[in-house]
Design a protein with these regions (language model features):
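Alpha/beta-hydrolase superfamily serine-hydrolase fold, recognizing
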Residues: 1-284
Length: 284
């Protein structure tokens, strides 16, 4: 079944005189519909909520309420500012779930690249006081727990990717990514290597940190030079060892961002189908 979708922009948060918007995709029907909070990529320091529109529309047409967020970014707002805004955004969407046609207990999160990292780490640490620092007026009891997480080519190891980019720059020559774009974003957002490691999901698991373990769908291309395969393998092994469930799908020959860059291709279509199927299975 394909639903008609209503789209609206709503201010969900304000810092000083700066509003931060959510774009809400609402399937038109009786519901209740699952809700997916989607987080854009951009190495934590650029891009906005409109970057993954194809995914937003596909989910909404399948009967999912999608909320895609903007948040504070460097240079004015390093880690953990974006986590505070996203944490607030998840609670905010839960507070509006009924009027949107959903339920507060039917919420998941997903993200691409750095957005995937933020979705995963926040899902693991929904009760971290650093992240929950912004009070939500009228709904103090709501939390930011989610029923499932979808990651598409996440920066799952910030420190590992930082060192990978610095190594590429030192070697010179052609590179699969531009280290002169990545390195400054890591520096601006994280400030230190210690913070990058503290904010790495696999590191948290390996330290024995007590975390939440929602089910995960992890999608990535085998030729993705921006998100090294060893980082993926480390996280998946650590998450499964801790008792979490990860559905991992590797797309042969695909590079970074293939879902958006190759819309209509067999692999992009299959990835969208998997995202839709996982959402309806887990967020209910």
């Amino acid at each position: 079944m394909s639903y008609e979708v209503k789209v609206e922009d709503v201010e969900y948060l304000r810092h000083g005189n700066t509003p931060y918007l959510a774009t809400i995709y609402r399937p038109q029907g009786s519901g209740p519909f699952p809700i997916m909070v989607e987080l854009h990529g951009g190495a934590w320091c650029r891009s906005d909520r409109h970057g993954d529109k194809v995914i937003h529309e596909a989910l909404a047409k399948s009967g999912v309420i999608v909320a895609t967020l903007d948040w504070r970014q460097p240079p004015t707002a390093p880690y953990p500012a974006s986590f505070q805004d996203i944490h607030y955004g998840i609670r905010w969407i839960k507070s509006r779930a009924a009027e949107l046609g959903g339920r507060a207990d039917m919420v998941g999160s997903m993200g691409n690249s750095s957005g995937g990292h933020q979705a995963m780490l926040l899902a693991m640490r929904p009760f971290d006081p650093r992240y929950s620092a912004l009070p939500l007026p009228g709904a103090p009891a709501l939390d930011a727990t989610v029923r499932g997480v979808i990651m598409t080519s996440p920066v799952i190891d910030p420190l590992g990717r930082y060192r990978y980019a610095k190594d590429l720059k030192a070697k010179g020559g052609p590179t699969p990514v531009n280290p002169d774009e990545l390195i400054p974003c890591h520096d601006a957002y994280w400030k230190t290597e210690e913070a990058m490691d503290e904010g790495a999901p696999a590191s948290a698991l390996e330290r024995g940190e007590k975390v939440q373990l929602p089910p995960v769908l992890y999608l990535q291309g085998t030729d993705d030079g921006a998100h090294p395969r060893p980082h993926l393998d480390r996280f998946v092994a650590a998450y499964r060892k801790a008792g979490g469930v990860v559905d991992l799908e590797l797309f042969e020959g695909e590079g970074q961002g293939f879902i958006m860059r190759k819309v209509g291709s067999p692999n992009s279509t299959r990835a969208l189908e998997m995202i839709i199927e996982f959402t309806h299975k887990q967020i209910r």
